[in-house]
Design a protein with these regions (language model features):
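Gly/Ser/Thr-enriched, mixed-charge loops and adjacent short helices
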Residues: 1-102
């Protein structure tokens, strides 16, 4: 591990026959199931217009999390457009890891 200086040095050839891309239908089923386990649907109903600011911080939750919040009934979901772009470089944040103190 300590000898790898760049991710491009890792040579991996995956078996494409074993990779199955899941699509919107799986996301929809997941969200449908997720909404059945709400701990307090009444509270969500009372506070559905509560302002929720969500950012995936350049991760992959950009579509699924807002869709899940909407499915729960929240109506005032605000996203951070600059951080909606999926990027492992995290160009808009100083430290993307919350376990590390910001510089």
């Amino acid at each position: 591990v300590n000898k790898i200086r760049n991710a491009s040095e890792i040579k991996f050839k995956g078996n494409k026959e074993l990779i199955e891309i899941i699509g919107q239908a799986i996301d929809d089923e997941y969200i449908k199931e997720l909404t059945t386990i709400s701990l307090s649907p009444e509270a969500i109903s009372r506070h559905k217009d509560m302002k929720i600011v969500y950012t995936p911080i350049h991760g992959t939750g950009v579509k699924l999390v807002p869709a899940a919040l909407k499915a729960y009934g929240f109506t005032n979901i605000i996203h951070v457009p600059e951080q909606d772009v999926v990027s492992g470089d995290f160009p808009t944040v100083i430290s993307p890891n919350p376990e590390e103190p910001a510089v």
